[in-house]
Amino acid sequence: MSRLDSMIRRLLAQRACLEAVAEMIEDLPGPVLEIGLGNGRTYDHLRERLPERTILVFDRVLAAHPDCIPPLDTFFLGELETTLPLAYKRIGATAVLAHADIGSGRGDHDSANAALLARLLPPMLRARALVVSDQQLHCAELKPEALPEGIPTGRYFLYRCIK
């Protein structure tokens, strides 16, 4: 499969997962975490799809399209091992949804980031919160959920927090 085809399939899976979880969290309060702003496409989609939610955004560098830059009071710039604990101090265990797009295509790097996220993310999540991730997360508090129909296993990952 070409890299273009792979990217298209990944983006289709991402959108399908985000659409599914948006409906699943309708009756649950709490902010949304967008981990990995990148150029801001997913953040833009989330703020359009979930306009009533506060969206906290995390990235190492700010490289988003100017129309997709979050407000400064919701943007955490820096490494996840620093920024996620800062956000936890602010919101506690209230996040209802976390979307993580942290893959780089470099296996060892991605595995290390996924392990870090699996350790730091669950304390920030409320019971029954959902996590959508481009990386597999191994954590006792995150139970794998079924992906939307048509999304192949391993293309994207969906979890529910079972506190």
Indicate where each model-derived feature is located.
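Glycine-rich SAM-binding Motif I of class I
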Residues: 40-44
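Class I SAM-dependent methyltransferase Rossmann-like catalytic core
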Residues: 1-30
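Conserved class I S-adenosyl-L-methionine
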Residues: 28-38
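S-adenosyl-L-methionine
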Residues: 61-92
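Conserved SAM-binding motif I beta-strand of class I
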Residues: 53-59
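A generic alpha-to-beta junction signature in SAM-dependent methyltransferases
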Residues: 26, 50, 91-92, 124-125
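Short SAM/SAH-binding signature in class I
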Residues: 93-103
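C-terminal substrate-binding/active-site "lid" region of AdoMet-derived donor-dependent transferases
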Residues: 104-163
